[in-house]
Design a protein with these regions (language model features):
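Extracytoplasmic segments of membrane-associated envelope/inner-membrane machinery
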Residues: 85-159
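Hydrophobic membrane-insertion alpha-helices, especially the h-region
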Residues: 1-14
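Terminal hydrophobic membrane-targeting helix
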Residues: 12-118
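Short, intrinsically disordered, charge-balanced linker/junction segments flanking boundaries
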Residues: 164-168
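Extreme N-terminal "leader" segments
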Residues: 1, 21-23, 157
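A generic secondary-structure signal marking the coil-to-beta-strand transition
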Residues: 27, 122, 161-163
Length: 168
């Protein structure tokens, strides 16, 4: 009986101290595969999960935050115990430029529109109003053919879903 009484007393005191400790809290998030500016954007978006328990991470919310960024093609999440989260990100490749509603946008290999990024390399321009999936289908056909994608100067899309290519 005395052992049970001592267990209750010391267990209660230790539980009070145990609750004050920040065990298993995420203290550091490492992002691999992006430049510093893109890392800052992702880290700002991830602030809500930074101090959560590493064992209780809601992957649905984490994936939703990461997938909402148009420049991310894919990502992998690794837990480094006791308090670090590593996120390996593959950045999307810019495939073409398109004018949508008077704005110059880029189409990424992830099928999303990206806002005007400062790019120093030449990309083909798409004239017309295609669906992104139609363009990605054409891109895969070009990749399987003898035509080099780098040789394409412009794409012309017609309402009949016909594509014309202008080569350099």
């Amino acid at each position: 009986f005395i052992y049970f009484f001592l267990l209750l007393i010391f267990g209660s005191i230790n539980n009070i101290n145990f609750n004050k400790k920040e065990l298993n809290k995420i203290k550091k998030i490492n992002i691999i595969g992006l430049n510093d500016n893109d890392k800052k954007i992702i880290l700002q978006n991830l602030q809500s999960i930074k101090f959560n328990n590493i064992f209780l991470i809601d992957y649905k919310d984490l994936n939703e935050i990461l997938n909402s960024n148009e420049f991310i093609e894919s990502h992998e999440i690794f837990k480094k115990y006791p308090s670090t989260l590593d996120i390996k990100i593959k950045k999307t490749k810019l495939l073409a430029k398109i004018n949508r509603d008077g704005k110059l946008l880029f189409i990424g290999s992830n099928g999303k529109f990206l806002k005007n990024e400062k790019s120093n390399f030449q990309l083909p321009f798409i004239f017309g109003n295609p669906e992104v999936k139609d363009f990605l289908k054409l891109k895969s056909i070009i990749d399987e053919s003898n035509i080099l994608y780098e040789d394409v100067k412009n794409f012309y899309f017609f309402p009949s879903k016909r594509w014309d290519l202008e080569l350099t």
